[in-house]
Amino acid sequence: MFYNDYMQSDFNNFQLLTSQADFDLEDEFTSSTNPPCLTTKSPVSTVPDIFWAKKSGGGSTPLLKTLLTSACEKDCYYCPFRAGRDFRRATLKPYEMAKIFSQMAAAGLVQGLFLSSGVIGGGVRTQDKLIDTAEILRTKYDFRGYLHLKLMPGADKEQVRRSLQLASRVSVNLEAPNQQRLERLAPHKSFLDELVQLLQWANEIRQNLIFDKGQRKPSLVTQLVVGAAGETDTEILKTSAYLYNHLQLSRIYYSRFSPIPNTPLENLTPENPLRPLRLYQASFLIRDYGFSPSDFEFDQTGNLPLQQDPKTQWAQNHLIYQPVEVNKADYNLLLRIPGIGPKTARKIIDFRRKNKINSEADLKILGIPLDKVSSYILVNGKMINQQLSLW
């Protein structure tokens, strides 16, 4: 075991907190009941759930996702931790959390930590406890792995600064795209003054922080609840574009609303899982492909159509009758073609500096999926299916 009998009470609280943490930033992780790095001889039932965060370059990292406390003084309508809801709660002190996590890391069970908390005694006091935990891990236990810290509503600017110095990533749960929608979820929170302000501070501070050579600046992320407040995709994507373009967020998570028993929203209908999928697709087009919210087609309710992904829909509306000459299109136009992403677009540009794209073999070398691009591109002035028939 990575804990002993003297730690049993702390560990029981730890297990409970970890099991309750699934609600927060749920889309960042995929869980495994028997992860391959689980080499301890302890029974699997004694080990808290370990989650696998996907790396941008492929592969995944085992992370622990947990809370300092599941007690909370906030009464957000959608949240399982809301004040007054009847369920078993638990709390750990910063040194208790740091000790248990460091032992899990030493045992090879985890390589990173995502730490959040319910709010008790205000945002400043709660943020202090998160920072204390991170400082113990970084200094006493010399932990140099991935650390994701939540920024609490009401935290002050110096706490944001210290969190950025300690963490690999920080996050603020906006939950809604604007104040009007937030009032339906958390009527006692201020969208601009309590939540967006934290992200603005974080972006400003990290531009001026001095990091060690090779150390990456901490990334910023947020989460929006989809389907609980009558918000439209138009609203969500306008806010998402602001967060990407002005505050340089790395990722926005769209959490599908699923009603929690014994909350004010328990009788609402769960959101269709296709809706957040379309939002993710549109979000990545804004972040990585140069799209803006005005490029998307919305239905009468202000939402993205569910039957087709937004990039294909844009191409159907704009490229089907005006296909793109692949030998002449600039980088930004290439990104608009279904099947071509940033990496492939750069390959095309590099290839064209020395050669001309003339054949199916050239397209295959560049990794261009013919089935996806054939309706939208020209090769030397001819549709690809016509050209291929001559080869």
Identify the residue ranges that each predicted region occupies.
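Residue-level signature of tetratricopeptide-repeat
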Residues: 351-352
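Short Fe-S-cluster ligation motifs
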Residues: 100-119, 282
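Canonical Radical SAM [4Fe-4S] cluster-binding loop centered on the CxxxCxxC motif
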Residues: 66-95
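Conserved AdoMet/S-adenosylmethionine-binding subsite of the radical SAM
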Residues: 98, 121-291, 296
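Flexible, acidic/Gly-rich N-terminal and inter-domain linker regions that tether
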Residues: 1-71, 369, 386-391
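Short, charged beta->alpha transition segments
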Residues: 64-67, 95-106
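Long, highly charged, low-complexity intrinsically disordered interaction regions
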Residues: 263-336, 368, 372-391
